[in-house]
Structures are given as C-alpha cells and as structure tokens.
C-alpha cells in the first residue's frame, strides 16, 4: 500500500503552561528565587519571569496527511516559531511522503542555517520533527517507540526535578534534583545558603536517595568548582548545567576538578549532533541531557545518542514528557528519565504539559509503562485556546 503524503502544515500558539513550562501563575516553585545567568542583576534575581523567561510561549505544530491522519507536537517557540513553520519550513514538507523524515529534517536545517543552528529555530525544527514522528506512528498504527526499534526495558524509572526532593522520595522517585537558588553575585552568603539547603534535604531523605543541583547556566568555573567540592560532603550525585552552554572549555575544566564520583551533566540548551560532539570530544561531562523538543527532535536525538554511546556517556533527556519517554525506553544508554514536578508546590504528580495535552502519562511510584497508543499517544486539549497567527 502506498504511503500517504503530507497535505497541510499548520502552526499555532497557546499561553499558560504547556510546552513553555515556565509560563506559570504567581507562586509556582519554578518562578521562585532561582539562580540564572541574570542573577548578577539584583532586579532580576527574585523571579525568572522578571527577565522574560516565559515570553515565547508554546508552539503547536500540526501536520495533516492525505489519508486524513493528523500528527502534532508541542515545544517552546510561540509566535516566532509559528512564523518560521508557516513562512519557511512548510515548503519542505507539503507534498512529501510521510516517511521522508530524514530528508525533511536535512532540508529544514540547512535552509535555516544562515539564521538558525540553535535556539528558537532548532526548537521549531524539533517541533516539526516530533509532529512528523507522531504522524508516522498514526499512519502505521504504532507507538513511536516501536518505530525506533522497540523497547529495551519493561518500564521507565524516574528522578524528579522540583523544590521538594523529600516529597519526591515519598512518591517513589529514585532521586530529586533541586534548583540552585543563589549564584556567584550573592557571594559567600549565597554559597552558604545553597549548602544549607542541600544539607537539610540530605537530612530529610537519608543517604540512599539521589540529590542533584540544577544550576541553569548561572555559575562560573571557580564558583561551580567550589560548590561541587563543598557539596560532596552531602553526597551530591551530579551538578548540572553550571556554565553557559558555549563554554566547553569551562566544562572540561570543571569535570577535571569535581570530587571523585560526582558527575558533571549538561546539554539542556545544546542542539544538534555538532554541539554535542563538542561536549563529548572535549570531555565536558559524564551525562548529557538533550531536550528532544529543542535539540533537533527525535531524528537528531538518534544521532546524538549514538555519539554519546560511543563515548560511554549516558543520555538522560531533559524533561519533554512523552517525547523523551518514547526515546528513553528504546536505548540502553538512557537508564532512567527525568520528570518535572509541575504542581505549583511540587507536592503532587501532574502531567508535565498540563493543561495542554490529554492522555499524558505520569509516573506511579516513580515508574511508568509507556503507553502503546499510536504516535506519541496524546491528544490536544480542546479547551486550550489555540491561535494561528500566520498562514501560508
């Protein structure tokens, strides 16, 4: 039977949660006093939204095939991403066979190279790529993980990212990743508060529970090295994304100087096989964390993961809900997954992209069997108001 072709490509935006998970109401833990690259400025220290972390909003990409099948995906990109999809990328998709994913990715990437490479352009390409995989799964009546070669384990195990690792332990997670609250601009007092927070959590969770620090690009090499060595006393498992993404030399230096047994992780804001090649060949980290909605999508993550495997480096994708679950379950070098605690107080398990997706699975007792519904197995919530700002 002949495969259908792509008939229509549409791009929408939506506000309030969803893929832009920083777009939350007041009082959410993710917008608390958390160290960022902007923490050097006191006026932008108390809230991440104060410097515009949520300005982009969510991008929804919808791709319709000639047989009526519709695939979709969500990522961070908002109106900028919608413009790129409608006015530039759609030409490389419409009329093509739904199986031509590699060619479509290649053309999207090289056509945007002069203004893209990373950032919102790669977010957008990632969203299109994920929608293509969702569409192919629906056309073939298979979950994406089967298209990727099938599962290598029966279930996923998760660590939790959020403000309350002590509650995450009670919920069955294998570890908890804390947002670092104070950066170098807050001097010795900030460093002391960071360590006191870690010590308090270690006291609450005991010795057999992973604790990690998410530093969100906020540190310099000197501070990160001090923090890592001081945190070793409290059994910190890894220190994450300490430095700006382009400081490969700094990451290599940091990794040489952290305590023995502590891992350095990064990659959330890296993109494509070429960016991750730098991290891997320069010995920057022990664990990479590509976001499948930002790094280039599933098509590129396959290549990134293979590179990492050849360097004996684990791949634990950043957040991204079902888009990472379907990948992680198929890879031996992805032994566990991340779950972002999106409840405002990090005190209950709610779907990461709530309220945008329906049927979005969540861990139970820190574990999950990935659903076998076609594609990524989720639906758009019809109660969320989608806006199509551009057409083509």
Swiss-Prot record:
Q: Does the keyword Metal-binding apply?
A: yes
Marked site: Transition state stabilizer: 338
Q: Where substrate is bound, by residue?
A: 22, 48, 338
One GO molecular-function entry: magnesium ion binding
Query: Per the UniProt entry, what are the Gene Ontology biological process annotations, in alphabetical order?
Result: amino acid catabolic process; carbohydrate catabolic process
- Matching InterPro entries, A to Z? Enolase-like_C_sf (IPR036849), Enolase-like_N (IPR029017), Enolase_C-like (IPR029065), L-Rhamnon_dehydrat (IPR023444), Mandel_Rmase/mucon_lact_enz_CS (IPR018110), Mandelate_racemase_C (IPR013342), Mandelate_racemase_N_dom (IPR013341), RHMD-like (IPR046945)
* Any Pfam family matching the protein: MR_MLE_C
Per its UniProt record, what CDD domains does this chain match? MR_like_2
Q: Where is the active site?
A: 318
Q: How is the cofactor bound?
A: Binds 1 Mg(2+) ion per subunit.
Instruction: Look up keyword Transmembrane and say if it applies.
Output: no
Record-annotated residues binding Mg(2+)?
214, 240, 268
- Enzyme Commission number(s): 4.2.1.90
Per UniProt, which keywords does this protein have? Lyase, Magnesium, Metal-binding
Q: Where are the transmembrane segments?
A: none
User: Can you state which reaction this protein catalyses?
Assistant: L-rhamnonate = 2-dehydro-3-deoxy-L-rhamnonate + H2O
Which residues are annotated as site, described as Increases basicity of active site His?
A: 291
Subunit organization = Homooctamer; tetramer of dimers.
- Miscellaneous comment as given in the Swiss-Prot or TrEMBL entry: Reaction proceeds via a syn dehydration.
Relate the protein's function as given in its record. Catalyzes the dehydration of L-rhamnonate to 2-keto-3-deoxy-L-rhamnonate (KDR).
Hey, which family's this protein in?
Belongs to the mandelate racemase/muconate lactonizing enzyme family. RhamD subfamily.
Q: What is this protein called?
A: L-rhamnonate dehydratase
Gene name as annotated: rhmD
